[in-house]
Amino acid sequence: MSETVSQNKETRGFQSEVKQLLHLMIHSLYSNKEIFLRELISNASDASDKLRFQALSNPDLYEGNADLGVKLSFDESANTLTISDNGIGMSRNDVIEHLGTIAKSGTAEFFSKLSEEQSKDSQLIGQFGVGFYSAFIVADAVTVRTRAAGLPADEAVQWHSAGEGEYTIENITKESRGTDIILHMRDEGKEFLNEWRLRDVISKYSDHIGIPVSIQTVVRDEDGKETDEKKWEQINKAQALWTRNKADISDEEYQEFYKHVSHDFADPLVWSHNRVEGKNDYTSLLYIPSKAPWDMMNRDHKSGLKLYVQRVFIMDDAEQFMPSYLRFVRGLIDSNDLPLNVSREILQDNKVTQSLRNACTKRVLTMLERMAKNDEEKYQSFWKEFGLVLKEGPAEDFANKEKIAGLLRFASTEVDSAEQTVGLASYVERMKEGQDKIYYLTADSYAAAKNSPHLEQFKAKGIEVILMFDRIDEWLMNYLTEFDGKQFQSITKAGLDLSKFEDEADKEKQKETEEEFKSVVERTKSYLGDRVKDVRTTFKLASTPAVVVTDDYEMGTQMAKLLAAAGQAVPEVKYIFEINPEHELVKRMADEADEEAFGRWVEVLLGQAMLAERGSMEDPTQFLGAINKLLTKV
């Protein structure tokens, strides 16, 4: 970082990510350039909220002026547009921290996702939240003059940058509290140096802002001619949207308010606005976004609702009102029961908080249930974005486990597609007569699941199997043990019994074959020793000679892989080797009198089974050697 200091004036270099963001924004967001005004007015509104909150404990911060608002003025001759607020303001350190750096975790990961394709970049930048930097879409230079509430006039700060990689910062004198942002407009931004253009944008984006947004207008005489006099005229309604009657709020207003609270560019999928009176008195406005934030799976991802108490802003990202598996929900909660001096620590162990959390959780789950029932296409859109996060729910929220399970979607053998469109309720509706379990299979990929040998008898008998191939699925099934009174059953576990779907003649024939093959099973056990837990015959296969399975209480293959990928110690998985006595290769093995040749057959069949189950084997050389010797003999 380069710095030059002249008295109190410094020239500093931007954090490298800021330079990249400025460049991308100017080129990617130009087609939607009016959003700069939404972002800057939104920031000014936040500054007023923060002042109100701090003034609760220190009223002197108002400095005799508690009428908060945002004012816009322009000067065509100077080519400038100024956005002013009398909110909390910033100190010198605040300015350096907020305007010279992007104080977000995972920024490097975010920038690695950007491409040269403007449409994709603009969407990603929108998810990232551009805030103050959006000013450079229309301005070739920006000046910020600010004084933090409570600081003397001579400790105000001026920040200036042309967005080229560095900025200057110096102390100035500023009598009024708050922030002035002066935009030196590019030629392409001059359209905003117009009263009617500003009115239009403010009405579009800022009607819901809870403080007045005014513009400086020219006073006209009785004949309608302009005079030299100017006045401030409030443009927005200045009533917090969530305090209004639902019937009076249009979809467009709800959508714009969502963009204000989330800094998202896209419209939300659905929302729920509720006023509750009774044991707890509160208003909630909850949104489900249409796109997942780029860092949703990042552990440092900020989530939660905006918290207001009696319409006074208290904090952003109040995570205590929404469980982690619903961390994608945006919006706010306004409570009349929490104290105005509430802190995050107090929220943690507060009965009101727990009650509001439970209510908000149920509200979101109900919203999702309605969407799934009434608009399958929209729900699929939601599932593609947030399905992985929702799968965390059964482990986290025992009380709502059944509701969450009903919202989960999977691939299945019923639908020849990797798309996860099958709900558990529809699976249960299609269950065969006499079927009392929900059968499922976990694998590394859809292709591996779809082609698994474990499916052969299920396909032959027309029994639907749910196919799971997300990394989280094996972990999920430790917590999701039943749905609608039906137990889940992994088809890769030993002891799987499909005999109820067999006729008596088949059962009798299998019994005879099993008896005949006892000696083959014993020879195989003797050869393998403790390399496997057991050797058994199986009749659940058709075109596959052998598989490996695990006991019900043994760790499954996918869970072992998940732990290994996370760097955890993984206990050895002991497999049960199941051979299909009706397969030609197994019959050839059984007919082999020579023990050495018999062993080669065992190696080949076990190796195949391990490859199909794990995608790898401990000793591929031994497997290949056995194949080569058998081929040579042929």
UniProtKB/Swiss-Prot annotation:
SMART domains the UniProt entry points to: HATPase_c
Chain intervals for the UniProt region annotation (A): 1-344
Entry-linked PROSITE patterns: HSP90
Key words of the record: ATP-binding, Chaperone, Cytoplasm, Nucleotide-binding, Stress response
Disulfide bonds: none
GO molecular function terms listed in the Swiss-Prot or TrEMBL record: ATP binding; ATP hydrolysis activity; ATP-dependent protein folding chaperone; unfolded protein binding
Gene3D superfamilies membership: 3.30.230.80, 3.40.50.11260, Heat shock protein 90, C-terminal domain, Histidine kinase-like ATPase, C-terminal domain
Highest taxon in the source lineage: Bacteria
GO cellular component: cytoplasm
Keyword field contains Cell division: no
Region (C): 562-634
Pfam families: HATPase_c_3, HSP90
Annotated localization: Cytoplasm
UniProt region (B), positions on chain: 345-561
Known role: Molecular chaperone. Has ATPase activity.
Subunit architecture: Homodimer.
Homology family: Belongs to the heat shock protein 90 family.
Protein name: Chaperone protein HtpG
Organism: Vibrio parahaemolyticus serotype O3:K6 (strain RIMD 2210633)
